[in-house]
């Protein structure tokens, strides 16, 4: 009989905790439901027309995209790491990841490996509020996303591009990407995340990103939201900052039928810099709602 401390026991332990997290999150969402205009922080945005439809929660299409189809959406004039998802599924062909002195890969790989156990226990799902129903929905159903860990004192020259591509090969799809980004002490990282639909089709992306900036860490995060006008994006970002850290989030909202940005900073020390910048350019039938929170815990 293999004990709980053996390799199989450790694997089952990780999967067991993840299963429990999913079940608990789903129970919270079922109790809370979707937010509505009755909620103070959602009084300007209604999801009623969106949630009345039926959606597929996973991609059934085996069709991928060619580099020529998406090349123009990358920042190609600079060297960079790339983590690319097509209809919520990781595309290794379009990606460039690394484990050389840092970890830039997919979250599912990190969750499945023993060497990331202590890091994930410390950070994963630790600053996501229990009363955010759409965050709970993401925790319950997410399958994939980006995992970025920059160790102490490491400052990579190349930025990281995270690309979420919706092809339109499958009508009415609901995507739940999840990103975990950790900048350890005295490290620095630049990240560009883009949401891009290729066809006019009904797609809802309920994205969640956790960012942890340890002491004296620097994070520059650029969000490019340029879906076509039939897409909905709900972007939930939770940022934990330790003393002397500096995190800047630059949000560019250009496309999509409905975009909702929930940006939350949690300052856990002194001499912290939290920068929020953005540009929103809309047409008459588009709706963008930015909701921000800066919580000074000390």
Can you annotate each of these PLM segments?
Residues 93, 97-98, 103, 107-298:
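Conserved beta-strand/loop scaffold segments within soluble protein domains that form the structured core
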């Amino acid at each position: 009989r293999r004990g709980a401390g053996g390799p199989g026991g450790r694997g089952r332990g990780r999967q067991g905790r993840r299963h429990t997290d999913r079940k608990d999150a789903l129970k919270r969402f079922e109790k809370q439901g979707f937010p509505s205009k009755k909620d103070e922080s959602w009084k300007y945005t209604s999801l009623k027309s969106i949630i009345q439809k039926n959606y597929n929660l996973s991609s059934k299409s085996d069709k991928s995209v060619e580099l020529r189809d998406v090349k123009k959406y990358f920042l190609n004039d600079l060297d960079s790491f790339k983590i690319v998802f097509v209809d919520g599924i990781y595309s290794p062909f379009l990606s460039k990841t690394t484990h050389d002195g840092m970890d830039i890969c997919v979250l599912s790989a990190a969750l499945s490996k023993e060497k990331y156990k202590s890091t994930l226990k410390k950070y994963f799902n630790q600053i996501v509020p229990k009363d955010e129903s759409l965050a709970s929905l993401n925790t319950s159903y997410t399958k994939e996303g980006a995992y970025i860990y920059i160790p102490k004192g490491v400052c990579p020259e190349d930025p990281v591009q995270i690309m979420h591509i919706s092809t339109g090969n499958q009508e009415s799809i609901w995507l739940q990407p999840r990103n975990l980004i950790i900048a350890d002490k005295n490290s620095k990282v630049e990240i560009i995340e883009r949401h891009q639909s290729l066809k006019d089709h009904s797609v809802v992306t309920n994205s969640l990103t956790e960012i942890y900036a340890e002491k004296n860490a620097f994070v520059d995060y650029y969000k490019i939201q340029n879906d076509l006008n039939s897409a909905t994006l709900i972007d939930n970002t939770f940022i934990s900052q330790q003393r002397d850290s500096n995190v800047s989030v630059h949000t560019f909202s250009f496309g999509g039928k409905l975009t909702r940005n929930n940006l939350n900073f949690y300052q856990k020390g002194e001499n912290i810099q939290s920068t929020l910048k953005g540009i929103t350019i809309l047409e008459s039938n588009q709706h963008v709602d930015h909701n921000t929170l800066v919580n000074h815990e000390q």
